[in-house]
A protein has these predicted regions:
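A short, N-terminal "cap"/entry segment at the start of jelly-roll beta-barrel domains
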Residues: 1-31
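Short solvent-exposed loop/turn micro-motifs enriched in small/polar/acidic residues
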Residues: 16-18, 38, 45-47, 71, ...
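Compact, glycine-rich, soluble single-domain proteins
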Residues: 21, 25, 36-45, 62-64
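A structural signal for the main folded, soluble domain(s) of proteins
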Residues: 41-44, 49, 84, 101
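Short, conserved beta-strand element in jelly-roll/cupin
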Residues: 48-62
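Short acidic-glycine-tyrosine-enriched beta hairpin
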Residues: 65-86
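Ligand-binding loop in jelly-roll beta-barrel domains
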Residues: 81-101
Length: 101
């Protein structure tokens, strides 16, 4: 996967004491995405906007809005609507792209 002709935020977005690190990418259309990595941990994300999380590498074990945990691997994705949440468990580094909206 590759994004062409984009603007990349120089400063990293660092969450959960460094367990989740990403950079914001803005496409020519103005659409924003973030490209990042989640290090081994279990984290909860509460969402104010809809997100589609796409796994690029690794395995993410995800519970959406309290549902049973599901494993997602490279090339798979999950969607959470605004106002929802997901809990992600990473046993090894999980590389991802977050598509907003």
């Amino acid at each position: 996967m590759q994004f062409d002709q984009v603007s990349v935020g120089k400063k990293a977005n660092v969450f959960f004491d460094g367990k989740c690190v990403s950079h914001t990418v803005t496409l020519p259309s103005g659409e924003r995405k973030s490209v990042g990595v989640i290090l081994p941990s279990t984290l909860r994300f509460d969402l104010s906007t809809k997100e589609v999380m796409e796994v690029v590498d690794g395995t993410a074990y995800v519970s959406i809005n309290g549902a049973a945990e599901v494993a997602y691997t490279a090339g798979q994705s999950w969607t959470v609507e605004a106002g929802g949440y997901f809990i992600i468990r990473a046993e090894q580094a999980v590389h991802y792209v977050c598509h907003f909206g």
